Amino acid sequence: MFTGGYTQKLLRINLSTASYKVEDIPESYYRELLGGRGVAAKYYYDEIGAEVSAFSDDNKIIFMTGPLTGTPVYSGTKFQLATKSPLSDKYICSNSSGYFGPYLKGAGYDGIIIEGKSSKPVYITIDDDSISFHDAGHIMGKTTFEVIDYMEQTHDIKRGVMSIGPAGENRVSYSCIQVEDRSFGRGGSGAVMGDKNLKAMAVKTNNKVKLHNEKALREYMTANVKACKEGKPTHTSHGTAQYTEVINDLGCYSVANFQTAVLEDASSIYATEMVKNYKTGNAACYRCPVACAQVCEVKEGPFKGAISDPEFETIGAFGGQCCVLDFAAIIKANQDCDAFGIDTMQAGTMIAFAMELNQRGLLNDKQLNGLDLSWGNGDTVIKLLKMISYREGLGDLLAKSPYEIAAEYPDYAKYLMHVKGMSYAAYEPRGFYGMGLAYGTSARGACHNVGGWTIRDELTSGKFDRFAIVGKGKMVKDIQDTRAYVDSLGICTVVRSSMGFTDNPSGNILEYVTGVDFTPELMDIGERVYSLERMIYAREGITRKDDYLPDRTMTEKLPKGMAEGSVLTKEMYDEMLEEYYDLRDWDTNGIPTDKGISRLALTELLKG
């Protein structure tokens, strides 16, 4: 019996009938899967079949908080999403911070399931137990920033707003659901929400999340704040942008659609220059003392007035991939992506893809329509982001999933750098092989987060030889399992270690919050979540063949830098993959075995 952390209530909203009901969430879901990503995957497994497509009325959007979401635990802001992705027509998980998750928990719900499809544009407001449907016709076409302004003026809700922009309305395959200035960034959930004619949701509450032992928890957090801040000092001063210089120097950066891994003359987009020339302050997520977001403003030039907080991945997408060395253009591109509601990472990679097609003479005059697609052209990047969001001209092609593009233009396929429809992150896997395995086996495509952030283990700590093969299966599995349980908790990975949430979990936070000491079981829960997601994938037709990387990664040697000459061949990759599958109790085709399913206690859970 839980005495805090959970409400054990699910809000199920049917858009087709403009109705809702509140359901109990079985306690067993929490005990075996914790919350967040794990419980969302369970509902997906039960309710979204393999035959359902992303834009089917039968597709659903499942939002789920974790036990620490909305609590005094540092960074307790995260909540998770599961749906069928328009990038692949397969399972996708995604997470966001912002205030919607914490406020949803305060309003009395651990999660929401959106089902059906509205016959007209709507938005939904949640005020504790009052759920209201509103006509959204007059706010269609508005940016996500404009939706926030509307919600504040009309409903007195500024924080706790979740919306899509024009990209979601136009079903861009990698459009986002924005949560204030944060987002469910990867996987195209914004397009699913747009297809359902749901423009926005907003929640407000004055209620706090119930805690098992609030006094002990607050004492622990007060004592821990120094360690939390001091453990990430450069995140406060420079944010994740600090990694741009590190990764570029090591020859592992995403450059020119992964043709190379070193960006020349890149100092103008390094964090030191960002801080010196553009930073105006820091922004923090709910209950976070680190405040890693670096708020930047362009003070002069054609992009004067642009304000955003570019992360490492966004800088990599537009700076590295598109070779844009004007940081002002990157700030503007980031702002526009947030406003239009599109994934900066996939957008940058798709524009880089177009730039390579242009480099190789594969785009005709009609497709180009006067666009200058030369590498480094920031003005063209800005133009294309709008064209993609509104599906105009070449933007309509680039708004599609890699699978759609490859089917329509087979000659373009070899230049699409993706796994399962999701583009690579800003890390070149030929520069550190574990990242390649992480991309290939990620539970949502080529993702460095869900797949495994191997940078610390392979590049900065010296724990593993980055070009080694043996041992990488276990390394990646451990990172993935850790991330799976952290995503199920409802906290951010940046501050997790200072609170004991590592691959060797410790501490009493979960007991203080829920009354149950989950800590010794966390890695097992993470592994259970990951294999559950793979069971979903297997049901949807994903096998070993889908875990392979693009040909460029496996056949072309890096031309320069500290990893010059490196290539991750199929034979090398297979060796890592075999080790990984064996440790997970998956068969040689990547399918979870009965032995593994039983060992992880998934057999009984999935009957319920």
Task: For each feature predicted by the language model, list its residue ranges.
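Extended C-terminal regions of large enzymes
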Residues: 152-187, 193-608
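Protein-protein interaction/assembly regions in multi-subunit complexes
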Residues: 1-190, 195-211, 218-235, 239, ...
